[in-house]
């Protein structure tokens, strides 16, 4: 069973039909209280993952919590999307092929996280 949850969301007004969205997440993530679990963080746009490239990060859990063991992550990529208001979302789910831990895995994305969204033309990339 995959558990999917929305971690962060922001609205962006994309003006040009031919441009792409450049998205960056910078922050600390952790999966804990398990040694077989794995979590996948990914960007979605209006509830759908980017069709031309996945923008994702995967972290495996550690068996025990031993203090502030967060990993700094920079998750970055580009996605083509139609013009208009876009909901840019950071989601987290179980990795495919990994069973859930008997205890609830600890996932944290609130240690000074930052999402940056900018509209770019193909020539700017």
Regions flagged by a language model, labelled:
Residues 1-125:
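Extracellular jelly-roll beta-sandwich "head" domains, especially the C-terminal globular C1q domain
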């Amino acid at each position: 069973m995959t558990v999917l949850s929305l971690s962060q969301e922001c609205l962006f007004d994309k003006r040009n039909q031919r441009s792409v969205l450049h998205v960056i997440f910078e922050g600390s993530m952790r999966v804990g209280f398990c040694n077989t679990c794995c979590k996948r963080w990914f960007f979605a746009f209006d509830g759908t993952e980017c069709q031309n490239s996945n923008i994702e990060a995967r972290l495996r859990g550690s068996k025990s919590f031993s203090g502030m063991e967060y990993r700094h992550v920079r998750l970055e990529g580009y996605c083509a999307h139609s013009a208009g208001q876009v909901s840019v979302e950071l989601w987290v789910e179980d990795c495919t092929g990994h069973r859930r831990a008997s205890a609830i895995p600890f996932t944290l994305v609130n240690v000074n996280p930052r999402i940056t969204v900018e509209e770019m033309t193909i020539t700017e990339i």
